[in-house]
Amino acid sequence: NRNAKLRILDGERLMAEADSAGEVCVIDVPSAERWDIDSPKLYTCEVALETGDVQRVKFGFRDIEFRADGFYLNGRRVFMRGLNRHQSYPYMGYAAPESLQREDARILKEELCCNAVRTSHYPQSQYFIDECDRLGLLVFTELPGWQHIGDERWKEQACENLREMILQYRNHPSIVLWGVRINESVDDDAFYARTNAIAHELDPSRPTSGVRYIQKSSLLEDVYSYNDFSHTGDNPGCKPKHAVMSSRKKALLISEHTGHMYPTKSYDTWSH
C-alpha cells in the first residue's frame, strides 16, 4: 500500500482533507450541500499518492431510496419522468463525440423536461453520464444484453460486465439504480441471484433492478422494472401494480410503455 492524501474540493476551495495508508479512508464534510435534480451540487475528490500520481473525480452527496410508493431523493418523494436512450447516431454509430453525448443530456433535461433517463440497454459514454451529473438527471443504467441468456461461460462474462460497470460508474451521483438483469429476458433465479449479489457487494449504497416484460416474474432485486405495452389507445393506460407484481411491498418502475412509434424490424406491423 502507498500513502495517499485525500482532499475534498468545492471548486478551488478546500472542504476537507485526510491522509490514508490503506484502501479505505473516511472523511467528514459537515458543510456539504446535497446533489439534487434542481440543484446538482458537485464536488471534487483529489487523491494524491506519495509517488506524485494524482487522480481527480467529480462526485456528489445525496440520499436515495425506493419505497413501495416510489422514489425518494434526499428524503423527498420524486416522480421519475424519463425516457430510454440509445447512444447511436447516423453515419457514426456509437462513436459519437463528447459534444453530442452532452447535448443529448441537455435535450432530455431542458427541452423534454425529463428528470430521469434509462441507458438502454448498456452502459453509455462517461461524457453523457458526466452531463447527467451536472444537469441533475437521474440515471438507471444496466448491464448489456437483450432477451438472450447463454451458457455458463456467457453468464460468467455477463457477471464480469456487471462488475466492470459498477466499478467504472459508481462515483456518479446521477446513477440511482443498477440494472442487473438482461433486458426482457426470462426468469433465471440462480443467475440473477448472482448478479444481484455482485451489485450489492460492490455498491451497497444503490438499489438494484432488472427490466422484464413478464407479469409477476421472480423479484430478486430491490425494484420491479416492467415494460408495459398494454395501452392500445382505448384503455386508461398502464396496468395497476397489483396486476404486475406478486408483492406490492417493493417499488414498481415502468421502464417502457405503449410501444414503438414506428416499426423497428421487418416483421413488425403498424398495428402494433
Model-assigned labels for residue ranges:
Residues 106, 110, 116-272:
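Substrate-binding/catalytic cleft of secreted carbohydrate-active enzymes
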